[in-house]
Amino acid sequence: MSAITITDAAHDYLADLLSKQNTPGIGIRIFITQPGTQYAETCIAYCKPGEEKPEDKALGLKSFTAYIDAFSEGFLDDAVVDYATDRMGGQLTIKAPNAKVPMVNADSPVNERINYYLQTEINPGLASHGGQVSLIDVVEDGIAVLQFGGGCQGCGQADVTLKEGIERTLLERIPELKGVRDVTDHTQKENAYY
């Protein structure tokens, strides 16, 4: 069982594209650039025989082989490749909900664990207000230096959110963290939620 699903419509669309390449044995390679970061991009590329990497996982499909990049594989859990037709023709879509989620464990560096909780627990809640928070640094005394953006920048409730929501969550999950500090310029209020 693969972590990625390629729908029948996507399979047929890709098989048609591959058949036009006039390269026997051509397949596709699925990978993520900058996985586990906010800049993650999920990609599908043609993969001629011999272009696959030895560590790639080969996923044999009805008409071709999809090679899954080994480093990207965990980030492709629950990913779906689909093809939807519309009046203009159609569009291939790749939904990879875990592409931007860092993979961490208890032994991961503090900054990686902070980013993980910001991405998975904190920012989804802030997104409902058009906001987000980013880790700038972890200073020597165990303080996470954070910066708000979007609807949180200039928001009158940012301090409450910082202390009651973000700090409480991070301190519960990362015992060696001692606190958080906000370095956002809250005088910029044009996008503020409150």
Swiss-Prot record:
Molecular-function annotations in GO: 4 iron, 4 sulfur cluster binding; iron ion binding
- Any Pfam family: Fe-S_biosyn
Q: In which residues is [4Fe-4S] cluster bound?
A: 152, 155
| The keyword Kinase belongs to this UniProt entry's keyword annotation | no
InterPro entries the record matches: Fe/S_biogenesis_protein_NfuA (IPR017726), FeS_biogenesis (IPR000361), FSCA_dom_sf (IPR034904), HesB-like_dom_sf (IPR035903), NIF_FeS_clus_asmbl_NifU_C (IPR001075)
Function field: Involved in iron-sulfur cluster biogenesis. Binds a 4Fe-4S cluster, can transfer this cluster to apoproteins, and thereby intervenes in the maturation of Fe/S proteins. Could also act as a scaffold/chaperone for damaged Fe/S proteins.
How this chain assembles, per its entry, is:
Homodimer.
Q: Which family does it belong to?
A: Belongs to the NfuA family.
Per its record, how is this protein called by name? Fe/S biogenesis protein NfuA
Which organism is the protein's source?
A: Pseudomonas fluorescens (strain ATCC BAA-477 / NRRL B-23932 / Pf-5)
